Swiss-Prot record:
SUPFAM superfamilies named in the record: L28p-like
Designated name of the protein: Large ribosomal subunit protein bL28
Taxonomic lineage: Bacteria, Pseudomonadati, Aquificota, Aquificia, Aquificales
Source organism superkingdom: Bacteria
GO CC, alphabetical: ribonucleoprotein complex; ribosome
Protein family per UniProt: Belongs to the bacterial ribosomal protein bL28 family.
Pfam family for this entry, one: Ribosomal_L28
Keywords on record: Ribonucleoprotein, Ribosomal protein
Gene Ontology terms describing biological process: translation
Gene Ontology molecular-function annotations: structural constituent of ribosome
Length: 69
């Protein structure tokens, strides 16, 4: 599972608790997407970004350049 390259968010281990109180191990996975990001120097790079960083404006999605043909 990928980590967010902006904030370092990664999967964490926890427990699922049933109504009867039984506990089972589980993994909480962050909502991470691989997308094209424009860096401050203007270059475009593919990186893993969590949606919280995307909504907060910590990264800017790279503009799409239509193919000519």
């Amino acid at each position: 599972m990928a980590d967010s390259e902006i904030c370092g968010k990664r999967p964490v281990v926890g427990r699922r608790v049933t109504l009867s109180g039984e506990r089972n191990r589980r993994i909480f996975k962050p909502n991470v997407h691989k997308m094209r990001v424009m860096l401050p120097d203007g270059t475009v790079k593919r990186m893993y970004v969590c949606t919280k960083c995307l909504k907060a404006g910590k990264v800017m999605k790279a503009p799409r350049i239509p193919k000519e043909g």
